Amino acid sequence: MFTFSSPRDRDRLLREIELLAAALLRLEYRIATVESCTGGSVAAMFTELPGSSAWFDRGFVTYSNAAKEDMVGVRTETLRDYGAVSEQTALDMALGGVVHSAA
């Protein structure tokens, strides 16, 4: 879950999400999230925006290594060699999110 030092910080992030949403709609793109340590907080913020189903496809919460492997196809070797919190694992998660969604 995101923590904000003030309500203004939260409002600022929601405005940024609105800008992202407008760009996605204009370009006719959809987005998906693949999260681990954030536990779905990014997807939760996206879905706070009315009409987000027009541009937000889905969110994967892959906290465990098994979830990373099962849901988005992160390779066991990647997790073994680089660890769950690594650039390589994040890249595999992002690619898997594209492959397993309509984004």
Place the predicted regions along the sequence by residue.
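Short alpha-helical segments enriched in small residues
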Residues: M1-A103
